[in-house]
């Protein structure tokens, strides 16, 4: 069996260290930095010939820098004769640009990034809760999309919930919310119907479902500015919800997210560590982070040992 090696870019060093600890190995010795003109500099400082190499790198903000860092690391490892290279991308940037809207003259940037990674020598991709599952089909290499939402579900099950109801913040999240509701005591589900006048600006219209005197669990794959989430929580409280908890895998938290969450009526926001939090977000009393290190470490171990990934999620 080829020797397994784990390398990390600069996007999520803390999660990378946690994963390495769970696998009882050290992170690979690589210098990943910048030249004086800002160009990316990578040097692999150990032998990787024939090794089964995993590179941990979320392509979060600064998205383009992190993508290029990953790409340059892949090229360096490929030229150093690594046996197999798996890109472990907990958060896949550009995932919301996965389609053309009618006849709009816009790119499908998720496909562009997938083509880029496939063409430079990535043999496999491991990612978490893709915004759109069809993105897996954009790649010319195998993609394992694991479910970080199950880590969130474990936290939900440990709460002392009073008459809970799972709430989808929009029509597009109904499938996700229904799956969580089924696993959460097969509870009821509500849907928030909203209109989005322009990107990152949303207006709550009405709630489909009875949320009065209930603990509401808002579930989504990501939180960006938090505007949608905070307005959803206000609408739920106005309709009589007792408590509102928000769960999301990817904490993008861009723009006015800190201000929005600070003023929000949400009782608690629970996210995963696919993206590092800025200090002003991390210090908010109503934001809590769960780690995916254990899940990702097990997925990496299974890939390296040619074992089933889907078996991790069989109940």
UniProtKB/Swiss-Prot annotation:
Pathway field: Metabolic intermediate biosynthesis; 5-phospho-alpha-D-ribose 1-diphosphate biosynthesis; 5-phospho-alpha-D-ribose 1-diphosphate from D-ribose 5-phosphate (route I): step 1/1
Gene Ontology molecular function terms on file: ATP binding; kinase activity; magnesium ion binding; ribose phosphate diphosphokinase activity
Residue spans crossing the bilayer: none
SMART domains, per database record: Pribosyltran_N (SM01400)
Record-given protein name: Ribose-phosphate pyrophosphokinase
Cofactor info, note text: Binds 2 Mg(2+) ions per subunit.
UniProt KW NAD keyword: no
Family indicated by similarity: Belongs to the ribose-phosphate pyrophosphokinase family. Class I subfamily.
PANTHER family cross-referenced by the UniProt entry: RIBOSE-PHOSPHATE DIPHOSPHOKINASE FAMILY MEMBER (PTHR10210), RIBOSE-PHOSPHATE PYROPHOSPHOKINASE 1, CHLOROPLASTIC (PTHR10210:SF41)
UniProt cross-references to InterPro entries, sorted A to Z: PRib_PP_synth_CS (IPR000842), Pribosyltran_N (IPR029099), PRibTrfase_dom (IPR000836), PRTase-like (IPR029057), Rib-P_diPkinase (IPR005946), Rib-P_diPkinase_bac (IPR037515)
Annotated gene: prs
Catalytic center residues: 194
Function as written in the Swiss-Prot or TrEMBL entry: Involved in the biosynthesis of the central metabolite phospho-alpha-D-ribosyl-1-pyrophosphate (PRPP) via the transfer of pyrophosphoryl group from ATP to 1-hydroxyl of ribose-5-phosphate (Rib-5-P).
SUBUNIT field: Homohexamer.
Subcellular location: Cytoplasm
């Amino acid at each position: 069996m080829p020797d397994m090696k784990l390398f990390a870019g600069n996007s999520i060093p803390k999660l990378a260290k946690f994963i390495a600890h769970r696998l009882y190995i050290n992170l690979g010795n690589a210098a990943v930095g910048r030249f004086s003109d800002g160009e990316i500099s990578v040097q692999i400082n150990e032998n990787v010939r024939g090794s089964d190499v995993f590179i941990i790198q979320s392509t979060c903000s600064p998205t383009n820098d992190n993508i290029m860092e990953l790409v340059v690391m892949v090229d360096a490892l490929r030229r150093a004769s690594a046996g197999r290279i798996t890109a472990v991308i907990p958060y896949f940037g550009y995932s919301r640009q996965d389609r053309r809207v009618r006849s709009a003259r816009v790119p499908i940037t998720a496909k562009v990034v997938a083509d880029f990674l496939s063409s430079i020598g990535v043999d496999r991709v491991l990612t978490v809760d893709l915004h759109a599952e069809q993105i897996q089909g954009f790649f010319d290499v195998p993609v394992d999309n694991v479910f970080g939402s199950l880590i969130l579900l474990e936290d939900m099950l440990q709460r002392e919930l009073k008459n809970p109801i799972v709430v989808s913040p929009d029509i597009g999240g109904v499938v996700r919310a229904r799956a969580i509701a089924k696993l959460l005591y097969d509870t009821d589900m509500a849907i928030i119907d909203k209109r989005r006048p322009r990107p990152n600006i949303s207006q709550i219209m009405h709630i489909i479902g009875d949320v009065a005197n209930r603990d509401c669990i808002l579930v989504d794959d990501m939180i960006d500015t938090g505007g949608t989430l905070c307005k959803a929580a206000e609408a739920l409280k106005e309709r009589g919800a007792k408590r509102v908890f928000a769960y999301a895998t990817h904490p993008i938290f861009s723009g006015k997210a800190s201000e929005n969450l600070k003023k929000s009526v949400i009782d608690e926001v629970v996210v995963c560590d696919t993206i590092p939090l800025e200090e002003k977000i991390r210090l908010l009393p109503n934001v809590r982070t769960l780690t995916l290190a254990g899940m990702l470490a097990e997925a990496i171990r299974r890939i390296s040992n040619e074992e089933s990934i889907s078996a991790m999620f069989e109940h």
